[in-house]
């Protein structure tokens, strides 16, 4: 997080423009499927971690 903050304050306008352009292209390519896949992966990972810890202990 600290690293991201530093770069953001350093070159704000330049980075903002670049990220915006990249984001739009990415959205067109993946679309809605990527968002759902990401959320599902996150949920599954969290659940798996919790289960593992419980079993170990």
UniProtKB/Swiss-Prot annotation:
Biological process according to GO: chromosome condensation; sperm DNA condensation
Protein's UniProt name: Sperm histone
UniProt-annotated location(s): Nucleus; Chromosome
Annotated region (Disordered), positions in chain: 1-57
PROSITE patterns on file: PROTAMINE_P1 (PS00048)
Gene Ontology cellular component list: nucleosome; nucleus
Function statement: Protamines substitute for histones in the chromatin of sperm during the haploid phase of spermatogenesis. They compact sperm DNA into a highly condensed, stable and inactive complex.
Modification Phosphothreonine occurs at: 9
Transmembrane regions: none
Tissue expression from the record: Testis.
Keyword terms of this UniProt record: Chromosome, Developmental protein, Differentiation, DNA condensation, DNA-binding, Nucleosome core, Nucleus, Phosphoprotein, Spermatogenesis
Gene Ontology molecular functions: DNA binding
InterPro entries, A to Z: Protamine_P1 (IPR000221)
Family listed: Belongs to the protamine P1 family.
């Amino acid at each position: 997080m600290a690293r991201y903050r530093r770069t953001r304050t350093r070159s704000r306008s330049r980075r903002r423009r670049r990220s915006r352009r990249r984001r739009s292209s990415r959205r067109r390519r993946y679309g809605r499927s990527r968002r759902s896949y990401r959320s599902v992966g996150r949920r599954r990972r969290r659940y798996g971690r919790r289960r593992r810890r419980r079993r170990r202990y």
